[in-house]
Amino acid sequence: MLSLPSAWLAELNDQHALITDPDGRAGVLAELAISAHRRGDVDAGQLADMLEFAEAARLWALIEDVYAA
């Protein structure tokens, strides 16, 4: 089962922030993921998943913005 840091998941689930600044929020998510890996909180596989989720969230937010306009 995939277990990711709860603080990181909270950031990932902040839809308003993602839609407001997709690129910036994805960057923050990536930095938080890398920091968690450096601290040893997540392994390499979890880091890869977190980075993929950050990119998926960015793309989702961009699509949401297009459909909201």
Predicted regions: what is each one?
Residues M1-A69:
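Acidic, Ser/Pro/Thr-rich low-complexity regulatory regions
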